[in-house]
Amino acid sequence: MGERIRGLYLVTPDAADSATLLASVERVLPARPALLQYRNKLADPLRQLDEARSLRQLCSSAGVPLIINDDVALARAVAADGVHLGRDDGSPAAARAVLGADALIGVSCYDEWVRAEDAAAAGADYVAFGAMFPSSTKPGAVRAPLTLLTRARAALDCPVAAIGGITLDNAPALIEAGADLLAVISDVFAAADPLQRALAYSALFA
């Protein structure tokens, strides 16, 4: 990746139906998040494909890169900008072989420094640590210390993402510790005014 990407990294919420999901995303895209990740652990593959295609169109129109969670094949099928890999989703090199040299490939590193080193060495475009705080999306997720963000920012060439339980109140501490990207679901999409909340996050990076 060229210029170091920084800002709000929006992750889609679980939604009862596709229309609700797409309306929620369309509402916040004017905030121009740095990235938008499509994450849906509940839908069947056909619905995932339909939603990802629709999100691709919305994101392309808004100039926001679309990342697909955990599914290289789906990312390729909809010509997404990249993929986010978890523990069992393969290597950055394998994903790049499928998606191409320009794909944005992120890797979940949880609280594991060695995993982050390995991911960066394998060509990851960003590494993600978390949960940084208790998370309603993943209540049992392992907690990662803020010191990992600082260490990664100093030692790795790729951007550093923080995820898990992030709010406007704790976000400044994460940025100060070294986070380039703040991955947020609930604190934006469950807000009374999601667009204004997203804009408030983006302003933290101004």
From Swiss-Prot:
Protein residues bound to 2-[(2R,5Z)-2-carboxy-4-methylthiazol-5(2H)-ylidene]ethyl phosphate: 135-137, 165, 185-186
Residues engaged in binding Mg(2+): 70, 89
A Pfam family matched in the record: TMP-TENI
Coiled-coil ranges from the UniProt annotation: none
HAMAP family for this protein: TMP_synthase
Species annotation: Azoarcus sp. (strain BH72)
GO biological process: one example: thiamine biosynthetic process
Family matches, as NCBIfam families: thiE
Enzyme Commission code: 2.5.1.3
Record CDD domains: TMP_TenI
Summary of the function given for this chain in its UniProt record: Condenses 4-methyl-5-(beta-hydroxyethyl)thiazole monophosphate (THZ-P) and 2-methyl-4-amino-5-hydroxymethyl pyrimidine pyrophosphate (HMP-PP) to form thiamine monophosphate (TMP).
Cofactor comment: Binds 1 Mg(2+) ion per subunit.
Residues binding 4-amino-2-methyl-5-(diphosphooxymethyl)pyrimidine: 37-41, 69, 108, 138
Catalysed conversion reaction: 2-[(2R,5Z)-2-carboxy-4-methylthiazol-5(2H)-ylidene]ethyl phosphate + 4-amino-2-methyl-5-(diphosphooxymethyl)pyrimidine + 2 H(+) = thiamine phosphate + CO2 + diphosphate; 2-(2-carboxy-4-methylthiazol-5-yl)ethyl phosphate + 4-amino-2-methyl-5-(diphosphooxymethyl)pyrimidine + 2 H(+) = thiamine phosphate + CO2 + diphosphate; 4-methyl-5-(2-phosphooxyethyl)-thiazole + 4-amino-2-methyl-5-(diphosphooxymethyl)pyrimidine + H(+) = thiamine phosphate + diphosphate
Name this polypeptide is given: Thiamine-phosphate synthase
